[in-house]
Every structure is written in structure tokens, then in C-alpha cells.
Amino acid sequence: MNRLVEWAFSKPAKKIGFEDVVQQRGKCALINTLPPSKQECLISGTLDLKQEEDFINSLLTKYTNTSKPIILYGLNACDETPYQKQRQLLSLGISEVWVYSGGLFEWLLLQDVYGETEFPTTTAAKTNDLLMFRPSMVLSRVF
């Protein structure tokens, strides 16, 4: 088992772009890694927290890990939580786990440009401030 964990952690992250999410939505399990306080606006088709738990448990107990690929996404491109979750799922033996690296921020920006039909969300992102989903500034604290 130790070698499996080492193997899972040594593999480079499998990443995808927004076009894969658009094309594969509904065919894959879409899971977010946002904190519970930020679950009000999600990419349409995202499993809610209870569904996610049930889905992962069914994979682990029924050994059906090849049945449905998983797409993970976080808040934005700097969010490391999807990669942490990917490593966790890989270490459990779930192999088809992909990270949409642009995250919710990129999705909402695309929705703002191309419309909700192409980039649907659970609440139509009725927020006036898309920048609340942007990455935090890092270099301003360094220099």
C-alpha cells in the first residue's frame, strides 16, 4: 500500500481546461473544493457536499472507480485545494481524477463574456463583483 501512495503522489497532476469541462459536464462527476461558506454559486452539474460524500463512498465500497471520471475545481487558478483532493483520491485508488485549473473564477469570467447558456452556474452568478473569486495578491506582501 505504501508504494501505491508513493506512486499517487509522484504522478504529475492531470489538468484540463474549460473546453473539457463544457464537453464532459454530465459525463463526469463534477466536484468543487470550495469551503462550505462559498457553495452558493457553483458550476452547473456540481455534486453538492452530500452527493459528493455518497459518490466517493460508493466508489470505495463498490470498487467502481472506473465507472465515472471525476473533475475537480477550486476557487481560481491559484487554489491548491483541487490538487490536494486529487492526491487524496489517487491515494485511495481512484484513478480518473482531473483538475480544472481555471476554477470558478475563470468559469464566471467566461460566463460574463459568453453567457450563462455556454457557462451555466447554479445561481447564475448574480454577483456584481466577480473579483471576489480572484486569487489573493501575494507579491505585494513580499516586496
Question: Which ranges hold each PLM region?
Answer:
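Active-site regions of enzymes building and remodeling cell-envelope glycoconjugates
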Residues: 42-51
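Glycine-rich, charge-decorated loop segments at or immediately adjacent to ligand/cofactor-binding or catalytic sites
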Residues: 107-117
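Short acidic active-site motifs
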Residues: 20, 54-59
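Short loop/edge segments at beta-strand edges and connector loops
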Residues: 14-17, 50, 101
